[in-house]
């Protein structure tokens, strides 16, 4: 990545999920785009109503570390007092356009945030890379210090934020007034003082083109006026990597890009040397730490399943469901089972399929059922935010008159999965597990649910609160298009928030967001779970371990997979085996998970990975066997973690047949 800058063609396609108080709203939006506070572009107004589309295209020159900032404005909201600012978002180029990947076209979503949190959405962009533009960056062109000062020569030190979220300062004799003011001072400026600063800024930059200075003015204006918002955007692209190795220095180029100087070799590079140092120095330490975590978790698992209340009855519980109506069938059956029935050996049959359940069928049953239960379309659960796909209980689920029965059923399904050592395919927010373990929740837990909301609460905590904020002990909620005021305490809508009671206000808000808004639903779910798994068993785990117990491990390590794989009628040196592992290394995480689910019945793994995989008769490695004619598709034996692959003639043919198998086939048979 040394001395690399390249040209990209940015196409703004459309906006997704732009919400105002929970309702999709028709806007006349346009975007201001800036790259590293240098390139400023204004788009046309988007067309459409429910789907806001642009088709706007612009060429940009970027480096892997460049930060692209998008600001959204609404023409409809422009008036004498407002320029129609809606919100902003940012992304580091290398996070969605890796320079060393041969692919040239990348589609990405940049999340938009608004100061009030009332708007949510993302801008869908297409980046098309064209040519590289190598640049030499001499090491003596820029200087960095740790304070903002005016020296005797009249120069000032300009604040800059690098791609890691760190603040650095650039010495410049032509520094504008606005750049010489620290962020701490800006936070305390009144609107009138801000206006004076902006006016001075415009006066000092009269020589620039009117369009560019107007755009630059807007970018700076909204970053400064909405400091908590700008902070959250910077944190979105921040990556903390620790100190630089000995002999290295971080500097800024003339166009404000971060680069690194190795004084021992007198060379410069774009590459962060901490990436390699961290990786090499911490391998053995991390390995030991991970092994200790695995060992402790395995001891807890062994202890749990050795307890008398976790013993599986030798009698059989047979559940017969249809693939098309798995949720409905399972609800009708499981809701009526006694606790003693649920402790019998579980056998699943899919209607019109001959497959016998030696483990693989029940693994697939829980995989399919969890996708149905936790689908936000059923309104039992919802995504925490538009950019946080962790699930939480939906407060609006109580509109269903049978919601308690449904959540008791969900708790029973979770209990059955744990009791019979199966995995669900779901990702809850961390506070959900803490509630199950009866751990107290605090303000910091809000961050795991909604980081923007958390930053707003944190700002209230750390700053003076007065009447101008118009806060009281209530919240406004949207319930199916109707705005409803909910008191956080009795008569809360008539009690103003001030510096004396703001901590009580924050506590009440946290309690409402994480607990009381879904208390009845959670109690029903917890009751169903405790019918099979008592608290005395659950509470030996922490919240992260409980997530692993319920869902297994999500990350798939191809090298670990390869290390614990057996072969029948193939060897590691056969072309088909070599191609298989090459394909897995190239595939996306989603496609690898689909293959794992196809071959084993689940897309999840034990905490220690492939070495602890189980089949119908205990521990069983993943196996690749040479079976079938090249005209046939690969075949899976999920009960035995076995994949039958015919001896195809090329890597392309293997990929084509595997892709068809994992995407188009479903159902069990017998041999």
Swiss-Prot record:
Coiled-coil parts of chain: none
Catalytic reactions of this protein: S-ubiquitinyl-[E2 ubiquitin-conjugating enzyme]-L-cysteine + [acceptor protein]-L-lysine = [E2 ubiquitin-conjugating enzyme]-L-cysteine + N(6)-ubiquitinyl-[acceptor protein]-L-lysine
Limits of the C2 domain: 1-112
SMART domains, per the entry: HECTc (SM00119), WW (SM00456)
MF GO annotations: ubiquitin protein ligase activity
WW domain location: 242-275
Domain HECT positions: 338-671
Membrane topology: Peripheral membrane protein
EC number: 2.3.2.26
Active-site residue list: 639
Origin: domain of life: Eukaryota
Location in the cell: Membrane; Cytoplasm
Subcellular location, principal: membrane
Outcome of substituting residue 640 to A: Abolishes ubiquitin transfer between ubc4 and pub2
Subunit and partners: Interacts with the E2 ubiquitin-conjugating enzyme ubc4.
Note: A cysteine residue is required for ubiquitin-thioester formation.
Protein name stated in the entry: E3 ubiquitin-protein ligase pub2
Native source organism of the sequence: Schizosaccharomyces pombe (strain 972 / ATCC 24843)
């Amino acid at each position: 990545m040394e001395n690399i800058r390249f040209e990209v063609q940015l196409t703004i396609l459309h906006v997704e999920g732009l919400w105002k108080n929970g309702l999709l709203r028709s806007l006349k939006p346009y975007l201001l785009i800036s790259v590293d506070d240098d390139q400023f572009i204004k788009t046309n107004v988007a067309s459409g109503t429910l789907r806001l589309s642009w088709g706007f295209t612009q060429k940009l020159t970027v480096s892997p570390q460049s930060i692209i900032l998008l600001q959204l404005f609404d023409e409809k909201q422009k008036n004498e007092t407002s320029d129609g600012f809606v919100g902003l978002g940012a992304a580091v180029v290398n996070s969605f356009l890796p320079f060393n990947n041969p692919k040239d076209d990348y589609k990405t979503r940049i999340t938009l945030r608004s100061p009030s949190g009332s708007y949510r959405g993302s801008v869908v962009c297409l980046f098309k890379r064209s040519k590289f533009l190598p640049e030499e960056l001499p090491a003596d062109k820029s200087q960095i210090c740790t304070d903002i000062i005016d020296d005797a020569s009249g120069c000032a030190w300009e604040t800059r934020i690098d791609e890691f979220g760190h603040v650095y300062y650039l010495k410049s004799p032509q520094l504008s007034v606005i750049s010489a003011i620290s962020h701490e001072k800006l936070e305390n400026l009144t609107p009138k003082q801000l206006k004076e600063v902006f006016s001075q800024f415009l006066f000092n930059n009269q020589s620039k083109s009117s369009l560019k200075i107007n755009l630059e003015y807007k970018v700076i204006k909204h970053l400064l006026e909405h400091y908590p918002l700008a902070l959250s955007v910077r944190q979105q692209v921040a990556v903390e990597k620790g100190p630089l190795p000995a002999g290295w220095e971080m500097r800024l180029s003339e166009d404000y890009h971060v680069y690194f100087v190795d004084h021992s070799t007198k060379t410069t590079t774009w590459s962060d040397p901490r990436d390699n140092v961290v990786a090499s120095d911490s391998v053995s330490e991390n390995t030991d730490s991970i092994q200790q975590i695995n060992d402790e978790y395995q001891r807890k698992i062994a202890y749990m399943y050795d307890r008398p209340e976790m013993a599986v009855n030798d009698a059989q519980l047979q559940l017969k469901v249809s693939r098309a109506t798995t949720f409905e069938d399972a609800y009708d059956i499981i809701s009526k089972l006694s606790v003693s029935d649920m402790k019998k050996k579980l056998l699943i049959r899919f209607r019109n399929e001959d497959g016998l359940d030696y483990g693989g069928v029940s693994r697939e049953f829980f995989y399919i059922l969890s996708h149905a239960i936790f689908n936000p379309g059923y309104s039992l659960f919802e995504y925490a935010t538009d950019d946080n796909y962790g699930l939480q209980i939906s407060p609006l689920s109580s509109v269903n008159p049978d919601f308690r029965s449904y959540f008791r059923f969900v708790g029973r399904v979770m209990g059955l999965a744990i009791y019979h050592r199966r995995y669900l395919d779901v990702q809850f927010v961390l506070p959900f597990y803490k509630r199950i373990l009866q751990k107290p929740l605090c303000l910091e837990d809000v961050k795991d649910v909604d980081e923007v909301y958390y930053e707003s609460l944190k700002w209230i905590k750390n700053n003076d609160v007065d009447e101008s904020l118009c806060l009281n002990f209530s919240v406004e909620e949207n319930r199916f298009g109707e705005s409803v005021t909910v008191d956080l305490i009795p008569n809360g809508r008539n009690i103003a928030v001030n510096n004396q009671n703001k901590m009580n206000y924050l506590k009440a808000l946290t309690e409402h967001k994480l607990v009381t808004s879904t208390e009845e639903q959670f109690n029903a779910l917890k009751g169903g779970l405790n019918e099979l798994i008592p608290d005395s068993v659950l509470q030996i785990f922490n919240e992260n371990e409980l997530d692993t117990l319920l869902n297994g491990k999500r990350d798939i390590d191809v090298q670990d997979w390869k290390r614990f794989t057996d072969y029948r009628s193939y060897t590691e040196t056969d072309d088909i085996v070599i191609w298989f592992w090459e394909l897995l290394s190239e595939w996306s995480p989603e496609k690898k998970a689909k293959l794992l689910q196809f071959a084993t019945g689940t897309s999840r793994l034990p905490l220690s990975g492939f070495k602890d995989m189980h089949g119908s008769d205990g521990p069983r490695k993943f196996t690749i066997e040479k079976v079938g004619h090249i005209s046939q598709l690969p075949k899976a034996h999920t009960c035995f973690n076995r994949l039958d692959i015919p001896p195809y003639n090329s890597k392309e043919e293997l990929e084509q047949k595997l892709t068809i198998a994992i995407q188009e086939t479903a159902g069990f048979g017998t041999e």
